[in-house]
Amino acid sequence: EPCDVIVEAASVAAARSHAKAVLEAGKDIIIMSVGALADEEFKADLIETARKNSVKIHIPSGAVLGLDNIKVGQIARVDKILLKTTKSPASLNRPITEKTQLFGGKAHDCVREFPKNTNVAQSLSLAAGRSIDVELWADPAEDRNMHEIFFEGEFGEIYARIRNVPSPDNPATSYLAALSILSLLRNLDSPLVIGA
């Protein structure tokens, strides 16, 4: 059946396997498994393919907010961009009994080590135009996925904390992430663009 846009919401592997073919078919794509774009060569190839075919790659806000504001990192001096993500050990498949830092470093490295748990880090990096700093924590006391964003620069300071509830249809995904796709789809053709 004809369509204008394809939504990838399966996995990093699915995005890597199918995104280019979607773009070559002249269709826009919404990539939810943003970790696939941590591979600079793959990302550059997709962008060039989209350009050649006059189509777009859409990255939804996913499980966070403020990607529109983080984009100022592409044009203004930034002193700090840190994402601190805290998840329950069960969601990370780790038998951890006390709060433990599992990762500290750049987003592109975190995506390689934890490909199923760091789409937020890659989304923020894409918005900022650079690989951001990431801390990944496991905490048995946390029953939700929590993302804290610390963003400082010549524009001022931003702190945001998001505690996501799981999607009722897929507990591995946050409900906010699922809703962000629906919001993006609803507004694709709107003449009023907010937060771009």
Regions found by a protein language model. Name each.
Residues E1-A21, G153:
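N-terminal glycine-/serine-/threonine-rich beta1-alpha1-beta2 phosphate-ribose binding loop
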Residues E1-P2, L23, S54, G73:
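Generic helix-packing signal
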Residues E8, D39, G105-K106:
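Helix N-terminus capping/helix-initiation residues
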Residues A9-A10, L37, A172:
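Residue-level marker of alpha-helix boundaries and capping positions
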Residues A13-K20, A25, V34-K56:
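Rossmann-fold NAD(P)-binding glycine/threonine-rich loop
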Residues D28-I30:
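A short hydrophobic/small-residue beta-strand
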Residues M32-G35, S61:
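Short strand-turn motif at the edge of the Rossmann-like AdoMet-binding core
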Residues V55-I59, A63-A196:
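Active-site-lining helix/loop region of Rossmann-like oxidoreductase modules
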